[in-house]
Amino acid sequence: MTDIITLENIDVTFKQGKQIVNAVKNVNLNVEKGDIFGVVGYSGAGKSTLVRTINLLQKPTSGTVKVNGTLLFADNKQQISNKELQKQRRSIGMIFQHFNLLNETTVVDNVAFALRHSSLSDKEIEEKALNLLKLVGLEDKAKFYPIQLSGGEQQRVAIARALANDPEILISDESTSALDPRTTNQILDLLKELNAKLGLTIVLITHEMDAVKRIANKIAIMEHGVIIEKGKLRDVYLRPKEELSRQFVGGSLAAIETLKAFNLGNLSPDQKLFQLVFSAANVTKSIILELYKELGLDVSMLYGNIEVLESEPVGTMFILAKGEPDKLDKVADYLKKENVEVTRIDERGIWND
């Protein structure tokens, strides 16, 4: 896939009184066309500031911004005219925690408002607005006013409005944080559907790992203006390297706490700890029994969990294997033949390879 967003060595600094605040520090990020890319971090991590550099709503202090093959910012200055920048911004839709709808205007006119500067006729604008409402499941609410809608329905209107200019990129900035869990999932599922149906690239800013886990395929975790970890969702979720990443990935943190509770101490030469990751196709296999039968190892399961990542169930198991050292060395090769991912870990739950 081709990169649709490229951020290189991005710095954003602000002056507060006599102090210089480094909101974003030397960040590099590549988003491929069709990605749903989650940017996760606590409040103040710099994630919204970073993502707003994509359309230069926040101009970097330094670095390079390229969107869809066009160089927007480099050498400490904007590289295109303001007119061209406005055109680029229309190719990037945005939705927020607050819906920002016009309360005195009908739902269909709220969507049509985004097309007021287009070359379409009034009739064409109304037709397009109605089609967008149908796309987000609100065709029956076209003549309603925002106050008559639920929070989830208002966010659907905001999504329809954000899609009015046929953007290739949609930035979702904490768009579900004000919604209840059920409505949150409905909005996330809608974004996933739009990604598949329209080929829409989505950048999902959130402090909620569950939102990323539900729909994203890639993730970056930010802290104090720095990306501390990034990669494919599955890789980061199942094997987080940084402490903050483990906090966001509750399953990994729970596994590590469980290992600590076993108080394993230093492992002897005839003991090894492994993390096993397996797909739904392998769930029915008795891995512990197979290791005993094939390699003569005594295996104890210390922790197990199943998560749904990218709509697929993925199982994780931490095991302690005991036996002859040469047999322990064969665990990884044997299980890989069974399509089970194997990573050796130490007694603290730190990934060694």
UniProtKB/Swiss-Prot annotation:
Main location: membrane
EC numbers: 7.4.2.11
Alphabetized GO MF terms: ABC-type D-methionine transporter activity; ATP binding; ATP hydrolysis activity
Keywords noted in UniProt: Amino-acid transport, ATP-binding, Cell membrane, Membrane, Nucleotide-binding, Translocase, Transport
Recorded superkingdom: Bacteria
Record carries keyword Cell cycle: no
Enzyme class at the top of the EC tree: translocase
Subcellular location: Cell membrane
Assembly with partners or alone: The complex is composed of two ATP-binding proteins (MetN), two transmembrane proteins (MetI) and a solute-binding protein (MetQ).
The name this protein goes by in its record: Methionine import ATP-binding protein MetN
Organism encoding this protein: Ligilactobacillus salivarius (strain UCC118) (Lactobacillus salivarius)
Gene: metN
